[in-house]
Amino acid sequence: MLSPKRTKFRKQQRGRMTGVASRGNSIHFGDYALQALEPAWITARQIEAGRRAMTRYIRRGGKIWIRIFPDKPVTMRPAETRMGSGKGSPEYWVAVVKPGRIMYEIAGVTEEVAREAMRLAAYKMPIKTRFLVRNQEEQQQEG
């Protein structure tokens, strides 16, 4: 599973997920992409589950790029612990995803295979997503 090798601080504040993604919202590497339509925290486990589903479906053909990285630690208190005595310890990592963010890209396969692989990955995500094609995405931005 993905997680940072080292961070400057062990714990982070929760923050807010307002607005749309200003970066990482266009296809850069592959021919097809999976784009987020809602804001959410995507856990490292969910990212890995999506990657596995896609890899298993496309088998040996094609290449997959994961465009999000879980760099935010989420802390949790032990069960049945009284209030106070500081913040809990980091339990897992999440990627903050805003609407418009490209999560996965794929190349080297046909559109039907890519669409099905992305559909399998989308089932693993806790948000609504959409399938993008590189040349169609460029036409939408112009028009």
Swiss-Prot record:
S-S bridge residues: none
The keyword NADP is annotated on this UniProt entry: no
The organism's place on the tree of life at top rank: Bacteria
Record key words, sorted: Ribonucleoprotein, Ribosomal protein, RNA-binding, rRNA-binding, tRNA-binding
Subunit field text: Part of the 50S ribosomal subunit.
NCBIfam families: rplP_bact
Similarity comment: Belongs to the universal ribosomal protein uL16 family.
UniProt function note: Binds 23S rRNA and is also seen to make contacts with the A and possibly P site tRNAs.
Name of the protein in its database record: Large ribosomal subunit protein uL16
Name of encoding gene: rplP
